[in-house]
Regions:
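N-terminal Rossmann-like FAD-binding beta1-loop-alpha1 element of flavoenzymes
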Residues: 2-28
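Conserved Rossmann-like nucleotide-cofactor binding loop
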Residues: 11, 34, 254
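Glycine-rich FAD pyrophosphate-binding loop
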Residues: 20-44
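Mid-domain catalytic core of redox enzymes
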Residues: 22, 221-337, 341-342, 346-358, ...
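Dinucleotide-binding Rossmann-like beta1-alpha1 core, especially the glycine-rich loop
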Residues: 45-129, 141
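Active-site/ligand-binding neighborhood in enzyme catalytic cores
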Residues: 115-225, 250
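FAD-binding beta-loop-beta segment adjacent to the flavin cofactor pocket
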Residues: 313-319, 371-398, 402-404
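A conserved FAD-binding loop/helix module that cradles the flavin
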Residues: 400-425
Length: 427
């Protein structure tokens, strides 16, 4: 069969490799000038680094397995990382039993409830019941009103704004579980990265695809999927139709109704009902580390970011210090209309709050990326809201990061969904 894949992110590349291993003919069409999607790298002041941060957890079996398949297991590195929380003007350690005991913003009963909640989340295997519950209600039931207000309310409000009350508990629970299980021992968090960054994996996938006869077409957006008799006929690129038997879309599903005008109205409506939160992600290169933490949650009403990620505290190759600062917000929020420089300036204005020693001459370089479909809004009942990957048009399949639900966004989930798409296509 001739198969066209739309999108050369990890999901599309893994799907292509699976199909090529089964002897199919595969072409991948990518709008960008490089492979990788959100995991693609850029030249940041002489340092090749990813547009958006990624990390690996101990439970990420799919990516760990893929690294083994590609002969890259020795490129996986594990780091003892630290987590922090900035609350009411003070930086606290977080993520260990000792840190919880020392945290003075909640009482002893709240601390016990918090610990029990994490232990409970670590043991959950079936998320179907929590798919019907809101995350806020779930947290308040386990932690109490005060601990929710101190530790979670600000994070929800600054990532989802008016949508913060309509998130599935399953969506949140898998995130808690993934981090809680990624430990060297009870007292030490351990997270992973790939030597050379995600580019190491992406280039290995590219090589494996091309060796098997697959073709990757960059700067080649698919303009339309042609359909005849309710069956895929071809993909139109630069005005030319390329005949194919299957089309697999791995770009945000919101693009699919435009690419495939023949989709039934009801199915297109289900796609359009899936909502996303964009991100404006500031990246800073500093002379020295801002904090000792990889991940810092910010639960402070005077700082309008939910947290920062000091990637260089995970991956020392990304030195001297690399900080990602994500601003999540709906496109309708007035702040989203600001230019990138305004977000960079706002970020820099907060740094001395997080570290009083910070000085302007620490800044070596700044950058800012935007992505419209950064975080899917997953309300209760999201399992039932997601349209099936196999569309009503024969030979047309689709998935994007919303299909990771209830799992966290990660390259590992891209691997899982990419392989699932390949199996569906061949069924």
């Amino acid at each position: 069969m001739k198969i066209a894949i739309i999108g050369a992110g990890p999901m599309g590349l893994v799907c292509a490799l699976e199909l090529l291993n089964r002897g199919e003919s595969v072409d991948i069409y990518e709008n960008d000038d490089r492979i990788g999607g959100m995991s693609a790298s850029f030249d940041f002041d002489g340092l090749p680094i990813e547009r958006f941060y990624h990390f690996i957890c101990k439970t990420d079996a799919a990516i760990i397995g893929l690294l083994g398949e590609l002969g890259l297991s020795e490129r996986l590195r594990w780091t003892d990382t630290r987590m922090g929380v900035y609350c009411d003007g003070r930086l606290y350690d977080w993520g260990t039993p000792q840190a919880l005991l020392r945290f003075d913003r909640i009482g002893w009963i709240d601390k016990a409830r918090y610990a029990l909640h994490v232990l409970h989340a670590k043991r959950i295997r079936d998320w179907s019941a929590l798919d019907k519950v809101t995350a806020v209600d779930w947290l308040k039931r386990w932690l109490g009103e005060r601990a929710y207000r101190v530790l979670w309310r600000r994070l929800f409000d600054l990532k989802f704004y008016e949508h913060s009350g309509r998130l599935s508990a399953a969506w949140l629970g898998t995130r808690i579980r993934r981090i809680a299980l990624s430990r060297r021992n009870l007292l030490q968090e351990s997270l992973g990265y790939i030597d050379g960054g995600s580019a190491t994996l992406l280039e290995a996938l590219r090589t494996a695809i091309e060796r098997r006869g697959g073709r990757i077409h960059l700067r080649s957006p698919v303009e339309r999927v042609e359909v005849a008799g309710n069956r895929v006929r071809g993909a139109v690129v630069a005005g030319v139709e390329h005949p194919c038997d299957r089309v697999i879309s791995t770009v945000p599903i919101q693009y699919v109704p435009r690419l495939v005008p023949d989709l039934p109205d009801g199915f297109a409506a289900r796609i359009r009902a899936i909502e996303n939160i964009p991100v404006v992600c500031v990246v800073l290169k500093l002379r020295r580390a801002l904090t000792p933490n990889f991940w810092l949650n910010i639960c402070d009403d005077t700082i309008d970011i939910p947290g920062i990620v000091e990637y260089s505290n995970l991956n020392p190759q990304a030195g001297p210090a690399i900080v990602y600062v994500p601003f999540y917000m709906p496109k309708t929020h007035p702040k989203f209309a600001r230019d990138n420089a305004a977000f960079v300036d706002e970020t820099i204005g907060y740094l001395s709050r997080l570290n009083p020693e910070f000085a302007a001459d620490w800044i070596l370089a700044t950058h800012c990326h935007r992505y419209e479909f950064a975080q899917t809004i997953c309300p209760p009942g999201f399992f039932d809201l997601l349209p099936p990957m196999q569309t009503p048009i024969q030979g047309l399949f689709m998935a994007d990061t919303s299909y990771y639900y209830p799992e966290d966004r990660s390259i590992s989930e891209s691997v899982t969904v990419g392989k699932t798409l390949a199996r569906l296509c061949m069924a």
